[in-house]
Amino acid sequence: MQKKVTIYTDGACSGNPGKGGWGALLMFGSVKRELSGYSPATTNNRMELMAAIQALEALKEPCEVALYSDSSYLVNAINKGWLKRWTSNNWKTAAKKPVENIDLWKMILELIRLHSVTFHKVKGHSDNEFNNRCDYLATQAIKNNR
């Protein structure tokens, strides 16, 4: 039986593009682990994806994951089938344009094959303490350049 892990993620960017940070909170039972990182030149969407990637990569074995994000870009790509269509269309959007952030989407595809992941949308900058913590981690990563 797989471990059940809850993950919250967030990305932030100072300017878009600009300096970016991401934060993640992993919870298994009473154990909590915080992760964060920084990029000197990026976009908000890349940081949202990177938060999910780094959180899923931190898992040491296949897990059942509930991943919560305030990123419509991330959650809708999975839940509305955009990612499947992009891969079927040779990484082209419905408008026949190249999909942005292909490198990161390919990493997410690999990770969701390893784990059983459900993606959930949460409202950003509201009263969700876990999402707010991830936002804090992401903005601190930008502030501290790490």
From Swiss-Prot:
User: Annotated Gene Ontology MF terms?
Assistant: magnesium ion binding; nucleic acid binding; RNA-DNA hybrid ribonuclease activity
Known catalysed reaction(s)? Endonucleolytic cleavage to 5'-phosphomonoester
Q: What is its main location?
A: cytoplasm
Purpose of the protein: Endonuclease that specifically degrades the RNA of RNA-DNA hybrids.
Self-association and partners: Monomer.
Q: Which NCBIfam families match?
A: PRK00203.1
Q: Note how many cofactor molecules are bound and how.
A: Binds 1 Mg(2+) ion per subunit. May bind a second metal ion at a regulatory site, or after substrate binding.
Please state the gene responsible for encoding this protein: rnhA
Q: Where does Mg(2+) 1 bind?
A: D10, E48, D70
Highest taxon, organism lineage: Bacteria
Q: Name one Pfam family in it.
A: RNase_H
Q: Record-annotated residues binding Mg(2+) 2? A: D10, D135
Q: Which cofactor does it need?
A: Mg(2+)
- EC numbers listed for it are 3.1.26.4
Listed under GO biological process in this entry are:
DNA replication, removal of RNA primer
Q: What is this protein called?
A: Ribonuclease H
Q: Where in the cell is it found?
A: Cytoplasm
UniProt keywords, alphabetically: Cytoplasm, Endonuclease, Hydrolase, Magnesium, Metal-binding, Nuclease
Entry's InterPro entries?
A: RNase_H, RNaseH-like_sf, RNaseH_domain, RNaseH_sf, RNaseHI
| Similarity annotation | Belongs to the RNase H family.
- Domain (RNase H type-1): give its ranges: 1-143
- Give the lineage: Bacteria, Pseudomonadati, Chlorobiota, Chlorobiia, Chlorobiales
Species source reads Chlorobium phaeobacteroides (strain BS1)
> Carries keyword Nuclease?
yes
Gene Ontology cellular-component terms for this entry are:
cytoplasm
Gene3D superfamilies documented for this protein: Ribonuclease H-like superfamily/Ribonuclease H (3.30.420.10)
